[in-house]
Each structure stands twice: as C-alpha cells, then as structure tokens.
Amino acid sequence: MRVSDFDFHLPEARIALRPARPRDAARMLHVASNGVFADRGVRDLPDLLQPGDLMVFNDTRVIPAALKGIRPARAVGGGGPVEVEVNLHKRIDASAWRAFVRPAKRLRMGDEIAFGETLKAEVTGKSEGGDVRLVFNAAGAALDAAIAVAGEMPLPPYIARKRGVDEKDEADYQTLFATHEGSVAAPTAGLHFTPELMAALEARGVEQTRVTLHVGAGTFLPVKSDDTDDHQMHSEWCTVSAEAADAINAAKAEGRRVIPVGTTALRTIESLASGPGIVRAGSRDTDIFLTPGSDFAITDMLMTNFHLPKSTLFMLVSALSGLDVMQRAYAHAIAAEYRFYSYGDACLLERRT
C-alpha cells in the first residue's frame, strides 16, 4: 500500500503537552466492530467491557535515556570540546548501548564522551542517521544507576520541541504497571490507568495479565519509503511469561476477548503467537509490521492513543479496524478536539468484522 494512504492533517493544537489529571479523566473514542464510533471516557471502560475479558498490559519501565555529554578536545587531529546529545535506544549487552547522537558528524570511532565526572562512553561503531554504538565504563546495575543520575526522561520529540523536560515528567511518563527497566519511550495507552480504574475493572470481572516489550526510539522514526512493502520496521525485545501465555490461551479457548493495552502489548502477543488463538511463552526481538490485510491471531480489541499521520502505528490500527473506518474516526476526533499522541486521549478499537 502507498504510505500516503495513511496521511491526514493534524493541527498542532491537537498535540497534548501534558496528560489529563487525574489520568483516567482522559476522553476515549470507542470504535465498534461495525465501524460505528461514540464519544466516551476512559472511566467508561468497565461499562464497555465484559466479565471475563482479559486486558494485557506492558509492564516495561522507562529509563532516563536522554543524556548530555562532552566530547573532550582531541589531542590528535584537532577539534575543541563538543557538546553531545545522546538518546539511548537499544541495549546491546551489560555495558553497551546503541544511541542516536547529535552532532554525529563531530564524532569519530574511538572518541570518548563524558557525562559528568565519572560516567564515560567510547564510540565503537557508527551507522547512518546518527546511530552509534557506545561502550560505557560501567556495566549492569552500576551502569543503570549511573544513567539514572546523569539522564533525563526521554520525552517524544514532538513534545520535547515545544517544552523542556521537568520533574513532573518523571512520574507522568511512567505507567502504573512499570516494573522492568529498559524502555526509552512509554507504552502510552497504559498511562491512563489509575488504582481506582483498576479496582472498577476488577469489580466488573475484567481480568488482567502482563507482558514486556522494551520500547525503542525507533517508534518515533518516520516511514521514509513510499510503499509499505519497502519499509523496514525497527526491532524491539519482548517477552511473554508462562503465566501470561496460560492466561491468554485460556481466554481464547473459552471464547473470552483478549484486549492488549497499547500497540506494544499487541505487537508482543502477535509476535509470539504460534497459531490462531495460541500464544507461546518466550522472548525474542520483534520487528512485526502490521498493515491492512495482516492477520491477528490473538487480538480482539485494542486500547491505544491517537497516532501520527503516516506512522506504523496508524497503519496498525488501520489493519485492526479498517483504514476507511480509522480515517473517519480520526477526522471526527480532530473535529471534536480530542488530544493526540503520548499524553493525549485514547481509543478503544474493536477488530473489524
């Protein structure tokens, strides 16, 4: 399909710079399986779901992956000190990360970047688009602790361009379920949930389980090809525990609905599906790319936020509910002044029949 088929005009005023307060006060557009949509709120979830429905949450935790450092003056080859912005996006091993850096052109293989007094990293690989491999002078838990001190919360670029990171983001950009550190962006659909909403869902008889996908910075990269067949999806690490697989498989076997919360939870369970209605426990890197015509082995409904024009995430929701339906639903959301993107409002999408 042509990438331009997934385009739409989004006024900048629709981009949310702060979350709703409280979190579950956000609005929610419900899109039924027949394409009919209705204006609701996140707090309406217990009324829209059924006893026995299984919600699947991503329990990844965002790390403070935005770092500012200095490349010292070179003793050989010239060049004074250079300020460097580093956004970690994928862990390679205990001491190495891949990162997007600026200005990448001012860095060479073997250059050292200093982040404060003690944390340092050496450039050991360079790729296109400012993507470099960094090896730090710490490893494992010690490196995690050093990054936590030196780094800032990595807000999406469309928010960071409009305002700086502040202390509110440290709490606002983590979900209620955040447990396993490793993401450089939040699984944003999970940001809408509060203890009160979870209690109401439990009282309704809605069940829950958790999976993990560590969100990479590639989630913000634009699609540069003209045709979806030519796009190479970024890969991210994900895992489904035996407990989660058992819960999902039991729900499917009993005819109960499985509802991932967020595209990351959906991509995880679909990546580890071994057949219709069956997901296997395990871990893997996934580059699954879902577009109209793709099959869904597990997902019956999806709760997600509103996404960028021509993004892989808008392609995913179009695959689930239909491109024509999503174009109409998004046009309605824009006209009705829904709030878009990471800190914005939500959609509850039923798989198209």
UniProtKB/Swiss-Prot annotation:
Q: In which pathway does it act?
A: tRNA modification; tRNA-queuosine biosynthesis
Major site of localization recorded for this protein: cytoplasm
State which Enzyme Commission number(s) the record gives.
2.4.99.17
Signal peptide bounds? none
A GO molecular function assigned to this protein is: S-adenosylmethionine:tRNA ribosyltransferase-isomerase activity
List locations, semicolon-separated.
Cytoplasm
GO cellular component entries: cytoplasm
An individual GO BP term? tRNA wobble guanine modification
Q: Which reaction does it catalyse?
A: 7-aminomethyl-7-carbaguanosine(34) in tRNA + S-adenosyl-L-methionine = epoxyqueuosine(34) in tRNA + adenine + L-methionine + 2 H(+)
Q: Which SUPFAM superfamilies match?
A: QueA-like
**A single Pfam family, by name?**
Queuosine_synth
Going by the UniProt record, its keywords in alphabetical order are: Cytoplasm, Queuosine biosynthesis, S-adenosyl-L-methionine, Transferase
| Family named by the database record | Belongs to the QueA family.
Q: What does this protein do?
A: Transfers and isomerizes the ribose moiety from AdoMet to the 7-aminomethyl group of 7-deazaguanine (preQ1-tRNA) to give epoxyqueuosine (oQ-tRNA).
Q: How does it assemble?
A: Monomer.
> Do you know which PANTHER family this protein is assigned to?
S-ADENOSYLMETHIONINE:TRNA RIBOSYLTRANSFERASE-ISOMERASE (PTHR30307:SF0)
Name under which the protein is recorded: S-adenosylmethionine:tRNA ribosyltransferase-isomerase
